[in-house]
Amino acid sequence: MALRFPRFSQGLAQDPTTRRIWFGIATAHDFESHDDITEERLYQNIFASHFGQLAIIFLWTSGNLFHVAWQGNFEAWVQDPLHVRPIAHAIWDPHFGQPAVEAFTRGGALGPVNIAYSGVYQWWYTIGLRTNEDLYTGALFLLFLSAISLIAGWLHLQPKWKPSVSWFKNAESRLNHHLSGLFGVSSLAWTGHLVHVAIPGSRGEYVRWNNFLDVLPHPEGLGPLFTGQWNLYAQNPDSNSHLFGTSQGSGTAILTLLGGFHPQTQSLWLTDIAHHHLAIAFIFLVAGHMYRTNFGIGHSIKDLLEAHTPPGGRLGRGHKGLYDTINNSIHFQLGLALASLGVITSLVAQHMYSLPAYAFIAQDFTTQAALYTHHQYIAGFIMTGAFAHGAIFFIRDYNPEQNEDNVLARMLDHKEAIISHLSWASLFLGFHTLGLYVHNDVMLAFGTPEKQILIEPIFAQWIQSAHGKTSYGFDVLLSSTNSPAFNAGQSIWLPGWLNAINENSNSLFLTIGPGDFLVHHAIALGLHTTTLILVKGALDARGSKLMPDKKDFGYSFPCDGPGRGGTCDISAWDAFYLAVFWMLNTIGWVTFYWHWKHITLWQGNVSQFNESSTYLMGWLRDYLWVNSSQLINGYNPFGMNSLSVWAWMFLFGHLVWATGFMFLISWRGYWQELIETLAWAHERTPLANLIRWRDKPVALSIVQARLVGLAHFSVGYIFTYAAFLIASTSGKFG
């Protein structure tokens, strides 16, 4: 008999029903569960797949560069970044009628095009690219890297080139190489690019390979570096009248601590950015030489962890046993990596708008909104994934003997206290926040807005004041003209910071009031509830009072049969599944808040947010309804406009989202009956009955249906909001 899918599981391959296909897809990447898997093959497969991942990333970024060079208007945009709409790529669609062709022919293009809201134009411009030829060169280089990555992936699957398990478990060497090589050397290389190419480019000098060695980035060359006069590199920075991309008003400094923003581009000073990357490079190059490998010097991570027993005895045996636990569990390592990456991605979202690094991106409002929303959603999925793999670690890899009375074991020992405290925090936040919103809503409905409960966020305002915001009148730290920090700041460090924080044209430390106070606590409710569900799922993954033997059933199980009540819906997978809904809900509130506050800021009517955000109808009417009006009227009997595609996507997103409920609010027996009926009809219908299938059609399992429902819910939710966000922002600001 020919080998059937899935080849990695002979048991599943012999399943006579359609479960074979769905379950095969579901477990394709769960290498640990495959037939004949060994620890060595597991590590080697994952390692080789990393190269495939890199190849895809390089191919994708190469495609971005290639399509902009081929179909975009980069060179025209460079001449006038504030008024030319950047084109992502052309749209080829024979179904378009003439009104559509006209509506989508924008940005000086000859035919219908998509506008770029990803910020790539601003990024490429800032780092020194100026012509289509530059873009093509970059695309080819990335294509080359993609091919190299594919070859490397293939190579590391060949017997001679397969690394051993001991190589994968050499944590010190890996840390040294990743810290100094990946972060240190790459940051140093990036500093080099900024200093040699980007900064001269911002001053009107075009540096490429042909003149790279002739153009000195600084008039003094390397002299100050070797003579210790490093301060010379910071002298004579670009002036406030500097026109980006020209020599007008430019200076000669390459590494500065100016603070604040370039007045024309509203982005961080390039010389500050170069300085930052140099500092990062230095720190990581040092950090990459900390751990003991071949030479018998440096730290041994195992020794550090074994020695660390916190005083007072409250944490038991501290970190004993953790080194081997982490080093032998891929899920633990992945959980740590995802948790870190998730936080970093969310920080990227926050900092890309508040401290924009790319020239003119702050004035491209739709791009700002798109990038913030994009990074927050990505962060949400990555963070929930961290807890999922944490739970899998507890089920598959955790060894109680190895971790006796250490910090990990003690987390499990007092999980009731952790879970109940989180539950209390969630309940407190939820009832109080909703209570305030509902009270205010009723007061507005009864025509007595003055009876609202409006709480000033005085602690947050005090923190903003401590950083230099003067409008609240707190007179503390950097907002106090008498403080030594304030006086030092004028000359020594970041003199531009205080100007920037008190200028109302950027997003640094926005003025906050009662509306912000309320939505902040709504978001806190979402974060705490999401965390509660995820933490409970992980801490109860091995077992609970209700089901002490839970770990024997694996990560995702529907129930322990009909005869054991209370065992349904309590697998660690179910907790992850429920948490994703809360995660999406929370990020919905986060992005609504960010977007509405910024729309009013950009339009110059901040009072609309301040007045309407304190009650529920304000959010529904003055944010959601007002901003979706153009989408609801995307095309009508009079033709269409450039927002029509978003109007269609808005509808389509709702459709996908609603489809999710068909899988979520439904039971398996209903589908099985329906399938039996359809199969019966199929077999008795002429022509149709010529087509036979080998697998008996069966309904999706409970867990699979939930996954399909969750996927539709998530995708529809994000599509709907993406269309709303882009259309409502670009409709107002072009």
Curated annotation (Swiss-Prot):
The chain crosses the membrane at residues 46-69, 135-158, 175-199, 273-291, 330-353, 369-395, 417-439, 517-535, 575-596, 643-665, 707-727. It catalyses: reduced [plastocyanin] + hnu + oxidized [2Fe-2S]-[ferredoxin] = oxidized [plastocyanin] + reduced [2Fe-2S]-[ferredoxin]. Its EC number is 1.97.1.12. GO terms for molecular function: 4 iron, 4 sulfur cluster binding; chlorophyll binding; electron transfer activity; magnesium ion binding; oxidoreductase activity. One of its GO terms (cellular component) is chloroplast thylakoid membrane. [4Fe-4S] cluster binds at residues 559, 568. Keywords: 4Fe-4S, Chlorophyll, Chloroplast, Chromophore, Electron transport, Iron, Iron-sulfur, Magnesium, Membrane, Metal-binding, Oxidoreductase, Photosynthesis, Photosystem I, Plastid, Thylakoid, Transmembrane, Transmembrane helix, Transport. Chlorophyll a B3 binds at residues 662, 670. Its main location: plastid. Phylloquinone binds at residue 671. It is a multi-pass membrane protein. PsaA and PsaB bind P700, the primary electron donor of photosystem I (PSI), as well as the electron acceptors A0, A1 and FX. PSI is a plastocyanin-ferredoxin oxidoreductase, converting photonic excitation into a charge separation, which transfers an electron from the donor P700 chlorophyll pair to the spectroscopically characterized acceptors A0, A1, FX, FA and FB in turn. Oxidized P700 is reduced on the lumenal side of the thylakoid membrane by plastocyanin. The PsaA/B heterodimer binds the P700 chlorophyll special pair and subsequent electron acceptors. PSI consists of a core antenna complex that captures photons, and an electron transfer chain that converts photonic excitation into a charge separation. The eukaryotic PSI reaction center is composed of at least 11 subunits. Belongs to the PsaA/PsaB family. This is Photosystem I P700 chlorophyll a apoprotein A2. It comes from Eucalyptus globulus subsp. globulus.
